[in-house]
Amino acid sequence: MKLEQRIFFLICLVINSFSNCSLLVAPDGYYNIYRENKIENILNLKPNGNKSQDSYYPDVCSKAVKNKEGVKSFILSSFPLSTKEYANVIVTKGSHMTLGDGEYHQIFNINRFLNIVCVEGSLVFSTKDVVYMSALVILPGGNFECIDCTIKFRDLYPTNSLIDPFGFLPGIITLGGSLSLLGKQKTVYSAVLIDENILEVQDISSLDIFNGYSLFIFSESFPLGKASTFTFNSNQIKVLEIKIPKTDKSIRVFFYSRFSTFSTSTTASIHITGNSNVHIENFYIDSFGRTTNDQYSDTELIFSQDDPNLITGFINGSNQRFRSSLYIEHSNNVTIKNSVILENRGETRSPLIFFGSNVNISGNIISSKSGSSLIAQYGTENIQSTNNYYSLSLPLLKSLNSTLDSMDYGNEGNGIFSISPKINSINDIFNGQIIAINHIILSDRSSITGFDKDCYSPCYNDSIRVSSKVQHSVEFKITGSTFISSSNYSESSFLFRISETGSKQSSFYKIINSNLSYPISVLLENNAFILDNVYGFGNFTINGLIKRLDIINSTLDPSVTSSISLSNFSKAISIQNSFMDYRSFQKQNNQIYGSIITPYLYYFENTMNLIKVSKMYPNVNHQILAGTVLNMGIEIIIIAPLFGKMDCIFEDESGIQTIPFNKSSNSCVLPYLFKNEGSFNVRVTLSLTKSLDNIIFQVYFPMVTVFNIYSFYSGWAMIDSNIEKEIIIDGNIFKKGCQQQVLGNCTISTNSKLITGLPSVTESDKLNRLFSSGITSINPYEPVTITIPIDKESKKNQIQLFFTHQPIDIETSLLSIYVENQPIFLLEPLQSNLDSTFKNLTFHYENSKSLEKIKITFITRGDIYLTSTAIYSSTNQPIYNEVIGINEQLNILAIVLPITISLFAAASILAGYLVIKKYKKPNMYYNRNTNGNIGMKVFSTKFKRRPKKVIPLSIPLSTNRITKKSLQSLDSMAENPVILLSIPELEKANEPEFNPEKTFLQESELLDLPTPKVEPEEPRINIVPLPRFPTVYKKEDNDKLLKELNITGPITSENIESFFEVDVGLPSLIIKNESEIILQEIDYIETGEIQEMEGSFLEDKSTDTTVIVTKSDGLPKFFQTKVFSKRFNDISKFDNDFFDLKEYIVEHQEESFEIPFMTSEDEVDETKINIIDFLLSPKSNKVALNMYLKSFQNRNHKLCYGKYGSNKNSILVIEGTSYYYDCTDVRLPISTPRSNLNFGITDGNKCIVDRKYRERLQYINVYSEPFRIYTLFPDSNDNVTITTSECCKEIDPFGSLDVDIFVTLKTTTKFNEKVTIRYETDDKELAFSTFVYLNLESQVSSKIDFDEIVLEKYLSEGSFGVVYSAIWRSSSVAVKLFKHHYSKDEIDKETSILSKIKHPNIVSFIGSLNFLNTYGIVIDYHPRGSLNYYTRNQNIKLSMVQNIRISLDISRACSFLHKNGIIHRDLKPDNVLIVSFDPDSSICAKISDFGTCREINGKHELNSKAGTTRYMSPEILEGLPYTYSTDVYSFAILFFELLSGRVPFREIPKREIPRFVRLGTRPRLDQDVFADNDISLILLACWNPNPRGRPTFDTLIDLLEKLLKKYKERAKRNKKNQNQ
């Protein structure tokens, strides 16, 4: 084969396995072109239309000269070259060539003619001499490394007459190999301006600055960088040629050398595709990029009409897209770190473009004169940008005459332009842009990209019930990033702009955990926008138009509050637990009923430094009967002492009531009597006097709607009128007969569909019948309208709408409701976590026009079904309808009380002296959550009054209108009156102020209303009889046994037990000894009814019985001899490795290995010899980690080699058969249509952890005699549970058999396993075997597969267990394995706390694991280790600035914990991890070890001692409960140790420390460092013996920030004095 043919063959067949790759013959003078349909194959998408998906590359390597075989050096003599002036060379596959420093004189000759370098093998440049070339092409499998090397690109030699029509060259093309550009030293640094030509730069002592370096400065005044010479003294640099304006605050410097550089003297580009590996670090890419900021104009091909592979001409484009400094597509293994990309040759589109690649870049300078600093094209779903400096000099901005189809974006002057990813920007600097982050939503991209199902983020399969393209909600995180907008632009600039393209699909878009000081623009006319945990200050404001705005857990400064006119751009607003300025806040008038306006309004800017509102009740919209008392109140946190008396002034439309503030409970509660019907807006004002002149806070309560008793007027059930009967509940008739017609009492719009057989969502059969059918839209997001009669005589009506949510996926589904075209609820979120749930929406309707019928419209994506409606009239007597008979008795439909979903907690009807005691808190429904439901199922609760608890008689009550019948449950015939509730299970994540276990209402004011949870129905148990067998068999009875059990071959120790375990028709066998076999007497097995699961065969609703396939708990004793263990475990190399280890231990007992094992060589208990026993004793078992690593590949053959696993006993099933690899082989007697089973998960989707999936395996007997089928499934284990309906079955001649397989993946894992199948006739003359392959991969979850963990290094050991560093899915992590004495509850507590808290100064929780009954957690790994190492190591001395900064980070972490109701309880240097010693870095320290942490609630006091005695507070040593002040004391001891370098209480015996601390002893402040009053006062305050006298961590943060600033300034002065 010719070389060019071989190269083309590789390109077409190796690069990404392209199926449609062909060589196109170009006209003379041009390179031939190869064409590939890469996108369809890589993205697993199918074309949807006539759009071309082809990409073209020049065939530049086909005539390259290959190297001589076996040569190592990339020099002239390594290639059979003539004395040409230019040459194209190729490093062939298998060759490893280098270019080093000592080969310069030979390189010089090559430089004169080196043109194109192709790499198919390996090529490493480590020379410090400049290498000139025109093009570098890395072919599939090729590897190119440039280590501290410099390459300069120039035009292709003119003597080479061939032209690249697509403009790739000069430059680099990487087509599926590996590209590494590495500099040995960091050259990018942050700088602080000391004077106009003096810069302070930290941590540059290791950089040999005078060794050929020049200085580039990037700042507000120099967006494209400014070069200068400099002088250097310590960490200060004096700039000689330029002066830096004092207004420049964000400065980066780059020390440029001629090493580690790619530069070009012409227009060039770097193009990376084909799933290439890219690592660019400490490198400089200079002057690349040729795509301008004008409209794209791509080169087009003209093909011959006779030959589709013949190009007859070109239409040359003037501006080929994606020829940038760095273009990366379909390559997810990309690292770009601490590098500089400078694109200043002209006005370009963008220096950095990603296409179908997830992005993680950090510490870079990206500078250009372009339309955007970074562009993320479709397929790039996530951007993680950290500490990057995006610097832009605005080009001449032009409007593009382009459409969406052209995908011509990003020319507007952006920092990051994105059309699809989720963006996380941390500590980035955007300098000179008009828009820092510009995000355009293309919710359905199919019409643009030409791909089927190309919707935003991964598309899910269409539901059985709903055909819909599904979107994820979208999250943006902007934390600590700075935006310096262009001063040369007159129009508005935005930190963030998000807009949609007119899609009718509604979704959530969120900015979370961000500090925003710049304007944002939001154009989401059909969507909801959420600010979650956002601090808005400075110039922050919101412009645009949205349908719904939610402000959650956020704080807005006064200037921000005044600039946000809420009612101008949002139709519905929800403000929860958020602080806004009173004088600037404008309450929305005529709010939509579903909105919640509950801001905490502060009066002065420093208010929140003194006092904060912690909670309020009610905290959701409330509905209540007239004449009922409702306890309304707030609770606050006092941060600093307040002088004078404080009052709580409650007021509404009817008047004002004032009560004194209760200092003991830090609350004020008012029993509020609502006498009249209507809607009431109550607010409470906290004032230092009874006057409103000294207001501190003002809080609006949610709307309280008061109504009189209503009569049931009409009810309608969405049921099939031809089959179902009308439904009567408590005498109230729910009529059938709603039809798609114009006339009639109840009509439905024609764009709806009726779905029957909805799953049960309540405990009541009656109610389930009412909710068993429902209507929804045929097409997603189309409004469905139902017209129903209403009492025209009643002005006030109450309407109940009952919905069943049958979710498509785990994403939030949105519901909007309109009555007579007026919005009632807008984009209310429903999330059911794949379980069907019941939702009730109840609201008032004012029939002011005396209508006889009303139109109710609802809009969903198609997975929410309206099942029934009920209308209540306020007239004295119900109005009868000529079609429907109405019960005359007063009846409130007690299905549920009025509740608004998702944002509304349940409110019970308060009858007589009933006052609610407990309330649930609203859920952060925006957060994705796999456990909690937004709404619980309906249940009934009997009304029980707490004994001896009464309401004061001074509160008037009204009970005369409530009857026993009106409160009776619809699904209970109990004599006692009951109230039926529907309480949404609303856990409010990230909101510590709402704690359901801690209420501030007084016990004397409460009545108990128990609310039992609904548990899923237990499966029915079927008893299946089995044949009886004799109890004992002797060896001589083996043949008889074999005959009875239809087993071939002798019963041996290798096969007997495991074989029977998987056979449903056989009892379990245990071999007692070598002469007896005992058969357990089992008369039945349990098989549970399995509910219908999602999969390929969901339409089959038959009930299946299953048998759980489980792994054996242990081998019988006969199997436990050393000889057998070796032989038995030959099947399992993993176990074999550890038996080898066991032998090693026996032979080396003098090393005292501390692992449990039997000393007798004749009997070994396998259950006690496993990997955990070794890994949990690493100090005494030196070989443990090595043996673990040795066994890793054997345990993970699927991960390491891509192979399938199988049951270790498969060899026993296959033995003695005719084996066929493919189960669809026509030579087999049993036909199996499919060899690969994917459980209905296709198109690259992944299954959900802990969800059961079903697949059906079908057998068809094509022979005229019966066969018996034995099926051996993989063992269930910690990662997967596999069950099946059949393991052993006979199939009749020409008959068929269906076997259902159920698989549940319990962790984040890949399940690629073989099912072993054996077919045999009764006489055993014909026996065949084959495999069926199971394929399933789970989505990423918090449960981790231990088999994917690669332990690398032992780190530490404690009483809890052992910590290792490890690799998990290419990420460095730390794995904490708990010792066996730790209970699962203790571990679950730590895991629960870690999973809830997300903060930069708290170690990040990645997941938990369970392996061989040993639990562990996985967290992020920080190689610098714990603070304890540095405080106890006398050879290491941290500076004061470093010590204070570390203490500040600890305080920030503890403040966050306390705000979330968590006490750490074990704060000490061991539990502080060091991230960086640079005080100016974003993170210096993180706290860890949450095994002793506890969440505080109102019922349980934390009395149990936890932590380390040396750091325990005196009140804990005295046995008093833990409080937040406990951590403050521990911090003081830690802070002392950090500053002094001494172990606290080192002079006191450890056992005596508690006694001395209780007596008031504290560490001595006798060192110079404590002469600073600012430091000593902090310590004295923090270890105050009175916990109430200790400051909060918020106060400490302020003090430490001031202290840090002081010592930084002192350090600068000292350095300046030293330099002088």
Swiss-Prot record:
GO annotation, cellular component aspect: membrane
Keyword line: ATP-binding, Kinase, Membrane, Nucleotide-binding, Serine/threonine-protein kinase, Signal, Transferase, Transmembrane, Transmembrane helix
One Pfam short name: PK_Tyr_Ser-Thr
Extracellular side of membrane: 20-891
Subcellular location: Membrane
Keyword rRNA-binding assigned: no
Protein kinase domain ranges (all copies): 1349-1604
Amino acids binding ATP: L1355, S1356, E1357, G1358, S1359, F1360, G1361, V1362, V1363, K1376
GO MF: ATP binding; protein serine kinase activity; protein serine/threonine kinase activity
Membrane topology: Single-pass type I membrane protein
Name under which the protein is recorded: Probable serine/threonine-protein kinase gdt4
Gene name, Swiss-Prot/TrEMBL: gdt4
